[in-house]
């Protein structure tokens, strides 16, 4: 009977304190059906509150657990060498007052940022000059340009961020989502390197 299995560690596992993570939770397994079921239910790690927020499970830990159970299994690994276990705790209910306060702070801050930018580049003078070029008349309040410009500014931000509140305009990720994705990749790489004690060896500890 073929006793070879293929394992690919998942990138991220979400768990709660007290959860027991099995090999099937931490990795995708492919191989003979009975062997696959047996390994999927094999305990690998128990999450506790002392683990705080992040635990790194290394492929060596998985191989060690499998071979302790059955040394005759031929394990072939595919993909990454670590999986990140993110420990989630019960979230506190968000205060309505705090939510409104933060929302107002962000709203006023973003409004001031836009206003200061337009003041720095003298956007009002630009609109006055454009109005005079187009119509041949000077108007210190060129609302004919300022109103469409303001509407276009708002629509442009909606298109740029690809969202209207929670509704996505299309499947294409926004620049902000791409930047957040790249940041998350860098953060995961940092955590995998610094939280995994197996990657660090001090020769003076021998």
UniProtKB/Swiss-Prot annotation:
Pfam families: SporV_AA
Record keywords, A-Z: Cell membrane, Membrane, Sporulation, Transmembrane, Transmembrane helix
Single GO BP term: sporulation resulting in formation of a cellular spore
Lineage top rank: taxon: Bacteria
Membrane topology term: Multi-pass membrane protein
Subcellular location: Cell membrane
Any single Gene Ontology cellular-component annotation: plasma membrane
InterPro entries named in the record: SporV_AA, SporV_AA_N_sf
Spans traversing the lipid bilayer: 97-117, 141-161
Protein name in the entry: Stage V sporulation protein AA
Species of the source: Bacillus subtilis (strain 168)
Classification of source organism: Bacteria, Bacillati, Bacillota, Bacilli, Bacillales
